[in-house]
């Protein structure tokens, strides 16, 4: 009987600890603005900011340009995203974690919270479907009352 109880407790601890809790956050106020891309060359300027970063290349293999999906979201919620060419992005510390472009990277106080991985099958529909992208990003950032 003790072994069964111990097994159940262990199982509950393992499964309970594996679930990653998502904590929503606000972007810095200045990004709740017009819904435009802001080109940036030096991410060091944003050390402690909380923002959305779009890293891109000049070619796209998706049927629908993912930039259109992102723009739909930006216009709907009037949220500005920073944009940086992937060649410049490779020179940043974020490149250690994000290896492919295009990508949307959610940054909180200068640290990556999560990102879309162009090399991951689970993220592909988020690049092509505005609703799926919106569902994903709204799990992380507050948008209540913005649309």
Identify the role of each PLM range.
Residues 1-4:
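Positively charged n-region of N-terminal signal peptides that target proteins for export
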Residues 13-16:
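C-terminal motif of bacterial Sec signal peptides marking the signal peptidase cleavage site
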Residues 18-20:
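Bacterial signal peptide processing site
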Residues 26-42:
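Post-signal peptide N-terminal segment of mature Sec-exported envelope proteins
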Residues 39-76:
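Local sequence-structure signature of Cys/Sec-based thiol-disulfide redox active-site neighborhoods
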Residues 57, 78-91:
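Thiol-based oxidoreductase modules, predominantly thioredoxin-like and allied folds used
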Residues 95-108:
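Structural micro-motif
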Residues 106-147:
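Non-catalytic, surface beta->alpha helical segment in thiol-disulfide oxidoreductase systems
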